[in-house]
Amino acid sequence: GEQVILMRNHEISFYQWHLAGAGPFKLRANFPGGVTRLVWDEKKRYLVDSRQTLKNALRNCSGGISPWGWLSCEETLMFGHGHVYLCPTDRNDCMKTQIIKSYGRMNHEAVCIDPRDNYAYLSEDRDDSCFYRFVPKIKNKPFVGKLQALAIKGEKKFITYSKFDAKKRYQVEWVDLDNQDKDDLRFQGQKLGAAVFKRGEGIFFDSNKVYFCCTTGGPIEKGQVFRYSPDKEE
């Protein structure tokens, strides 16, 4: 139609300066994260609606589109946070928001979905992060399954930001993780041989491939872009 729905993350940290009434700015502790759903009329070029659809969240950094709605990722572990939330795009309230704990608790950055099998691919914004996927047991129950971390075949704890040769193709495998409510998934994965990435960022699924980038990866720490082919496991 003529209307576009934009799901806008609130990437705001826990402590921010806020205007307190008519007085001076002061530091106030609150939960300023979340998601706002905006409806834009392309033809008339005006904002039709703007409402918050996720509240009580913190530092919603990136996320990704999915068959079920917008997936919003928290990039913080403060106060028990660090989850992915499902925000339906067809609702203008917070009633149907869902925490996806099976996607793990970590410094989440972004996520994408392979619509062929509903596998989720997730990045983590840390200097010593892993690259993750969530494998549903069955396709129509996308949030029930197992969490895994990517490993390079034949390489234990491969350091991608200094050893990766862009001219080569690497065969990969996945190690299973014990998905508890702790910020230790990367340590679990690397103990089992998972590859190490430097500040995982955006992810996108296109033409049956997963593309993702790292902010400070590479020999000069100016970033890397990776392509993963699920069909070939490389």
Q: Model-derived features: where do they sit?
A:
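Sequence/structural signature of beta-propeller domains
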Residues: G1-E234
